Amino acid sequence: MKENKKTYLVTGGAGFIGSNYIHYMFRKYGDAIRIINVDALTYAGNPENLKEVEDRENYTFVKADICDKAAIEKIFAENEIDRVVHFAAESHVDRSIKTPEVFVQTNVYGTAVMLNCAKAAWELPDGGFKEDKKFLHVSTDEVYGSLEEGGGYFYETTPYAPRSPYSASKAGSDMLVKAYMDTYHFPANITNCSNNYGPYQFPEKLIPLIINNALQGKKLPVYGDGKNVRDWLYVEDHAKAIDMVQEKGRLFETYNVGGHNEKQNIEIVKIIIATLREMLPETDPRREHVTEDLITYVEDRKGHDRRYAIAPDKIREEIGWEPETMFAEGIRRTIEWYFAHEDWMKNVTSGDYQKYYQEMYTTK
């Protein structure tokens, strides 16, 4: 007999947003839920992100690729899955420019596998789907393209206009989910979120990259003129939004999730420098070299989108979600986490990361 608790299948749960989501869910629901985490453990997936929960009886880790249909079918066959929360994706724009085919394989084909397996497991013989099942596809605001400086926002009705191989692959996966909802009446939602920051983020991304380099006295690479604008959201606020959409979102709807926090990249870098200097004791030798002199402008990213800005009106009005963490607080919490987890950073920045870093950040 099935236990009276919801079972969540989380894909990519060893990555940055996925692991934060799992931690959030266990903090909120404790033993009232069960989570199965399937992750291929590629370079950005780190089992250390989930050390605190790995011994829980209601947590199971499965090392598998979402493109492996047999492995995913086995999970559905052996478990009564109530929710799929689909994070698993290749997500770094720079890497997509070098190896776009990897992004198409994981983000588009992998999503098709997940959709097919969930559909097969949840379909009823006489049509329709089992009650209280839902597939939540986690996506990005980058599918909407680029906005002009100082004007306009992305809404759920904004036409898709992806400009990088990464955003094109995510747009493709979004369209697959939309097609399943339209064709099969498949129980799903899509969330499109702005840039996240917080604990466990792999240091190829801007904020952990700048924190890590500044503490080591290394150059702080800034693309182009540094004036590209992003909307930043603390990752725990994103985890809460996903949970609320799962429980309160209307089926077949898309919800934009944003932080109401637009900042230029160069602003972010300068805020991190100032916050590090404020937080480091005067006796800490690292404090002396954490200055704006480390800022180094590098060749701009190919096709670099100028501005992203999300309008989260719909999720606020329908579900009651709003970002709770102000950027000043969130960046301090993020820096505190990296201070407390220096060994984690050392482990993830060894080996292949150093080679990648040298390839990506050449001086102008």
How should each PLM-predicted stretch be described?
Residues 111, 174, 206-207, 308-309:
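Generic non-transmembrane alpha-helix signal with a bias for helix starts/N-cap capping motifs
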Residues 20-24, 28-29, 35, 64-67, ...:
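C-terminal substrate-binding subdomain of Rossmann-fold SDR/epimerase-dehydratase oxidoreductases
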Residues 53, 150, 203-211:
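A glycine/serine/threonine-rich, flexible loop-to-helix segment
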Residues 20, 48, 74, 95-98, ...:
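Generic recognition of short, well-ordered alpha-helical segments
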Residues 12, 167-168, 201, 232, ...:
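Residue-level marker of alpha-helix boundaries and capping positions
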Residues 1-196, 246, 275, 333, ...:
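N-terminal Rossmann-like NAD(P)+-binding domain of SDR-like oxidoreductases, especially those catalyzing
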Residues 71, 102, 109, 202-206, ...:
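Residue-level recognition of oxygen-bearing side chains
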Residues 80, 164, 186, 199, ...:
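A general, composition-driven signal for non-globular sequence regions
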